[in-house]
Amino acid sequence: MNKSRQAALYELPTKLQNSKEELGKILEEEEEYYKYISEKFKYSKRAKESEEVVGQMQEAYKLIDEAIDILMKYLLIDYT
């Protein structure tokens, strides 16, 4: 494996973790917005859309977390 590819692989978990943290912050804000919208406009299209966005963001957050775990296992197995 060439050195630039190896370096990129080692940087990837950090980049994914940073993305996960950013997504976590945005997710918190979106969850607060969803709570507000769902209380104020219980059955509106806007509340439903917000609920869907929160669900998709939660799923993305879980997938990023799983990707970090898998990548770290790969790096530890391959390069130690």
Region annotations inferred by a language model:
Residues 1-80:
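Long, low-complexity or tandemly repetitive, helically biased scaffold regions used
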